[in-house]
């Protein structure tokens, strides 16, 4: 190993050690020469004593000088180098501390001036870039909003079937306890066979615009999804196409398939239940009207009775099937859940736009299942047909059992049934002549009738089969970033798998995590009470992929621990146990490098529960304590507070000593350490691992 690869402090130590050895060698040589020159054997003891004293004095002086050099030159230079490297490679903008380099002459002030100039230049550049990128950021936000609310799930995958993009609808469609994550295999969420076959078909075709329709099922709950796959064309070359990724659009057709199966079953039952009595009736009627039929009155009476019985069976079957048809018909039409207040406002606006007078909507806090556009057109049509002679019109939406009642009230003359039927037979203004009020009622499997109220008021009643109250969810499920699109298109250009040790750091997927516990001693019965984690993919933290949950430790939480992290026994009383949480966390961290601040402490708690969890936490691990020592030197403070302060990261007071707050702070520190590591030539995982192993003693001291 060349001297240039050794640390500055070690090289200075070796220099003074060599100086000490040289002095001792010169002293010994001088004493030996003097003794032989004197040629008096009795003087040997004097030479030995004198040489020993002189040697110790030399070693002491050189040791003191080395200690002063180490404390006032080597360490400050190492600290100064780490600070400069942090400022040149990361976004640290705090002033450089000159006090540590007070014995370095003009070096520390010069370094501080360089850092200040760098900050000013960087700020000016940032402002210029910010001005130029504001418009692009707005366009990006608009595009993300658009893609987050398209009515289908959208996945973008690499040729190796790793996720590069997904939107909010895709998260809902894929379902399951484990949300999608960037750089995860799509086969974790969808059964692979249909996707592999469709991908192979598209790769084999020569048409760059070809698409493949397929049916696939979710791994979590077996829902059937209709999908369309299209390759991302990057050229006509066959090899380029083979390396291209693909877009997969998803739509849940489980309800459509159930509705289709229900219709098929109803039709089969219809023919089965009608065929036999109809055939029997045909035979009986043929016998009764035949000229050579039975002349005996008793026989003819029996035939007529049998015909009546078959007719009764037929009528009963028709009525039963009609009722089932009415009950199922609403499921055969795409109906959406719409707020009653929005429905009332839409009717009011349409009535006003058509000049049909005033209408007061009075709605309950309900979600209504209906075809909003056609139902609004129907109610507006009825208001218009009521005319100006009927005053004080009011639209009420009331809860009615499992459904709702839409009531159109007015003061004035009643509506005759014949007039109402005429109104319902008229076409509605929806752009299709065949859409009438009666058809809208049929789609919703409902009817409309008039009722008389008190004091000269009347109303038309229209019940809806399905509605539900709107209220706060007593157990809301937090969504880290609602309806968000999550993507990293750089993953498309990433090469294939390589050995972990040779993989560049910015190509790895990291899961940064932290735990809160009942105490500091896993061997003494302390347990985890909270786990939080975030994912870093392609060198950036994915905002929408967060793991954060309380854990029921199955034991009391000491007051001293609660004073640190704020977690009480009441907060974890209904939380899941470590067995369930551990399995979920293992899935979240699957295939990633684990990162933590003082990782041995957190991992010890998890590894002691591996048998209970049923999973082994054998992921590769990096520790930000050791990475800090690599960048800033072992002599610096390496607590999380010291590291974040050194890197210019602010931890909000309310987030301090919480699992998620410390996790986010550790992740930000880790991201700022990566450029500093690369500047030292540590670009691969193996190189970093080799370097951090030199600081193993520091980790042992921290956990002693």
Swiss-Prot record:
UniProtKB keywords: DNA replication, DNA-directed DNA polymerase, Nucleotidyltransferase, Transferase
Ranges where the PAS domain occurs: 139-192
Reaction catalyzed: DNA(n) + a 2'-deoxyribonucleoside 5'-triphosphate = DNA(n+1) + diphosphate
Pfam family, one: RNase_T
Keyword Disulfide bond attached: no
Swiss-Prot/TrEMBL GO biological process terms: DNA replication proofreading
Highest rank taxon of the organism: Bacteria
Matches recorded under PROSITE patterns: PAS (PS50112)
Residue span of region DNA-polymerase III epsilon chain-like: 511-704
Keyword Oxidoreductase belongs to the record: no
GO cellular component: cytosol
InterPro entries, alphabetized: DnaQ, Exonuclease_RNaseT/DNA_pol3, PAS, PAS-like_dom_sf, RNaseH-like_sf, RNaseH_sf
SUPFAM superfamilies per UniProt: PYP-like sensor domain (PAS domain) (SSF55785), Ribonuclease H-like (SSF53098)
GO molecular function, one term: DNA binding
Family annotation (SMART domains): EXOIII (SM00479)
The EC number(s) this enzyme carries: 2.7.7.7
Known partners and oligomeric status: DNA polymerase III contains a core (composed of alpha, epsilon and theta chains) that associates with a tau subunit. This core dimerizes to form the POLIII' complex. PolIII' associates with the gamma complex (composed of gamma, delta, delta', psi and chi chains) and with the beta chain to form the complete DNA polymerase III complex.
Family: In the C-terminal section; belongs to the DNA polymerase III epsilon chain family.
Task performed by this protein: DNA polymerase III is a complex, multichain enzyme responsible for most of the replicative synthesis in bacteria. The epsilon subunit contain the editing function and is a proofreading 3'-5' exonuclease.
Name recorded for this polypeptide: DNA polymerase III subunit epsilon-like protein
Organism lineage string: Bacteria, Pseudomonadati, Pseudomonadota, Alphaproteobacteria, Rhodobacterales
Gene field: dnaQ
